[in-house]
Amino acid sequence: MDTIIENELVKELANTHGRTRESLIPILQDLVVHKRFLSKQDMIDVARELDISAADVFGTATFYTFLDTEPRGKYVIRICKTISCAMKGKNEILSTIEEILKVNLGETTPDRKFSLLEANCIGWCHKAPAMLVNDTPYTELTPEKVTEILREYIKK
């Protein structure tokens, strides 16, 4: 997208959500939905539209795990890193994913199909270990189960 179109999207989102500090997170969330990540230019445009500092926008965007500030793969895998998931085998699940996708945590596959990230709590502690693939939760993971899940995404 070029800057003019991006700026129009920011204006449209500000019209929808408002131009107050409280509108910042909903606007950033919607930008991620539309563009899959927040560019530096997006954050500057939002700051101008809401009349707040770019540093405030950047600080907010980088604080929240789900507000990506760099391009990600088509499928973003977020593995929960809470103590509940860790105690239930998160490290084994992570190793399995890294082995299958041939990437390390924080990386994206060369074909840009998958990104592998950790997230703080994703809300499934009672069914740990858990992960999200984009917005789809997968729980009570085992190496076998995660292998099966990834095979389905690889086929897509």
Model-predicted segments: where are they?
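Signature of N-terminal electron-transfer/Fe-S-associated modules in redox systems
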Residues: 1-156
